[in-house]
Amino acid sequence: MTKVKVAGFGVSLDGFAAGTTQSLGHPLGLRGEEVFQWVFPTRTFRQMLGKEGGETGLDDRFARRAMEGFGAFILGRNMFGPVRGEWPDDQWKGWWGDNPPYHAPTFVLTHYPRPPIEMLGGTTFHFVSDGILHALQKAREAAGAKDVKIGGGVETVRQYVQAGCVDEIHLAFAPIALGQGESLLSGLDLRALGYRTVEHVPTDRATHIVLAK
């Protein structure tokens, strides 16, 4: 049965999953990359960049789990790019270049419709402007027997969790405090939403917590 998951989502000790002032130069916001220091050295992440080498320990195991087994992805518009408002043209095709790491249908939430973009490696970006539930329906259909990943950003994850749509959440808590940014957990009563901890794995760079219903 298809499950909807949040996976590999970095969070600071004070609950922020992105920094302030996202821009082309700072796609994760100011200091936002600090919550993902656990993933950058892994073999899985380096392969996503087309590079060799990388670490193969516990962090890599979680990084691999965060990308494998998914038949469709859902992204908020910020996860696709820094452009705001109407699309000025068709030039911007995502943060990852011509061959994004999704390799599956990827549904981008937006208020502004845009034709699908077919990329190298099996990724096609579909732009959904009629709500999170319609996007999830499309993603489930596209995923077939595989799972659907809610890839972020912060507000997109919060909306799907609050709507009761997410079966499993993997958070990687970084040992740093951002002080400010986009809060992931503020106002979310995970216990009331039915989540319990099913996995808890500390590493040198993060503490991996997996919650499930």
Residues of each region from the PLM?
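Enzymes that bind and transform nitrogen-containing heteroaromatic metabolites
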Residues: 1-213
